[in-house]
């Protein structure tokens, strides 16, 4: 079972935000908080971060019900441009209410768990 689902632009516009219709205005379409990993297949730090995100996705999948997605910036250049992604990895944390927050670079699992708990779960 895939714990971190890769999204293309069409899936992103139905599961996360319709970036075509809501230019300049954030409207989250998801039913659960989400974490999105902007990555590249050639990126060493992205490869190191991937298993950590898989572990977190498994940890939060049932307990707190958070969706984990990934976007390949080489395949989905439009999405990367919308979010100003110029380096990878970049993580986008999307709470149910409020504005999303971006974080650059890979972090240890403990740091990511703390950020998820604070930003997405309000703990």
Question: Across the structure, where does each feature detected by a protein language model lie?
Answer:
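Typically the conserved alpha-helix immediately C-terminal to a functionally engaged Cys/Sec
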Residues: 47-61
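Non-catalytic, surface beta->alpha helical segment in thiol-disulfide oxidoreductase systems
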Residues: 87-123
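Structural microenvironment flanking redox-active thiols in thiol-disulfide oxidoreductases
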Residues: 66-81
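N-terminal targeting signals for export/organelle localization
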Residues: 1-13, 55, 117, 121-123
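Short pre-active-site segment immediately N-terminal to redox-active cysteine/selenocysteine motifs
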Residues: 31-32, 39-42, 87
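Hydrophobic beta-strand anchors of alpha/beta hydrolase catalytic cores
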Residues: 35-36, 68, 91
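A short beta-strand-turn-helix
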Residues: 8-34
């Amino acid at each position: 079972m895939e714990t971190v689902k890769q999204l293309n632009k069409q899936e992103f516009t139905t599961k996360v935000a319709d970036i075509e219709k809501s230019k300049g205005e954030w409207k989250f379409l998801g039913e659960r908080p989400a974490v999105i990993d902007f990555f590249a297949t050639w990126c060493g730090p992205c490869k190191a971060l991937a298993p950590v995100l898989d572990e977190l996705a498994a940890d939060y999948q049932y307990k707190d019900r958070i969706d984990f997605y990934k976007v390949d910036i080489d395949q989905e250049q439009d999405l990367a441009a919308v979010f100003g992604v110029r380096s990878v990895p970049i993580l986008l944390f999307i709470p149910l209410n409020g504005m999303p927050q971006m974080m650059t670079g890979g972090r240890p699992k403990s740091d990511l768990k703390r950020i998820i708990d604070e930003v997405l779960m309000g703990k």
